[in-house]
Design a protein with these regions (language model features):
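Intrinsically disordered, low-complexity acidic/Q/S/K-rich activation/interaction tracts characteristic
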Residues: 1-2
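Short boundary/linker motifs that mark transitions into or out of structured domains
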Residues: 5-81, 85
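Detector for Asparagine
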Residues: 7, 44, 51, 75, ...
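Extended aliphatic helical segments
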Residues: 10, 23, 35, 48, ...
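DNA-binding patch around the recognition helix
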Residues: 27-32, 77, 119-128, 143, ...
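Short, charged/polar micro-motifs that form catalytic or ligand-binding hotspots
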Residues: 52-60, 142-153
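Short amphipathic alpha-helical recognition elements used for nucleic-acid or partner binding
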Residues: 55-140, 159
Length: 180
């Protein structure tokens, strides 16, 4: 039944919606071809528009940038971004993630020799917290910095949990850009 698509937490969250709006959510999950996503890169209030419904990411900027990176990769890039398990994949994922963070902060994307400066600009723009900058700058065993497997997995898990809080699980599964 359609009721089975919602857990109690989701029903409680959607209690402010009319029943007809709730049914629209269920039907949307059953018609993936009708799902559209639009990313709004407002640094003060980023959100993802799922058809006409906003999903607020104001307090989840890292998750927003991660989501944008993965969705963009899935939809337009020839080599979709995957879990960064090698030095080259870490560099690819870091570059793509930094690109989304730069778009969100509305700053020029520059790093490489100036990776520390770039990350500090993101911190100054209230996109990154100090602990996140330190995490991205921590050298791994292979000498690389940036997005490592642990950081990637944490972002993926946090994003999925957040989407499940905001949407029926079937719809969250549908719009999650990588398998959980």
């Amino acid at each position: 039944s359609q009721r089975d698509m919602f857990n109690d937490e989701v029903i409680a969250q959607f209690s402010q919606l009319r029943y007809s709006e709730l049914v629209k959510q269920i039907r949307l999950a059953q018609q993936p071809e009708k799902v559209t996503l639009k990313f709004d890169f407002d640094k003060n209030a980023p959100c993802v528009w799922l058809n006409q419904q906003p999903i607020d990411f104001k307090d989840r900027k890292l998750d927003f940038a991660f989501y944008a990176m993965m969705a963009r990769s899935k939809n337009i890039e020839e080599d979709p971004i995957e879990r960064p398990t090698t030095e080259s994949s870490k560099a690819l994922v870091s570059s793509a993630f930094y690109r989304e963070l730069a778009l969100l902060a509305n700053i020029t994307m520059s790093w490489g020799k100036d990776e520390v400066d770039f990350l500090e600009k993101l911190e100054d723009a209230d996109i990154l917290e100090t602990r996140t900058v330190k995490s991205l700058m921590t050298q791994q065993n292979d000498g690389s910095t940036g997005v490592n497997v642990s950081f990637f997995d944490t972002r993926k898990n946090n994003l999925y949990k957040y989407l499940k809080q905001k949407l029926p699980q079937a719809l969250a599964n549908l719009i999650m850009p990588i398998s959980e």
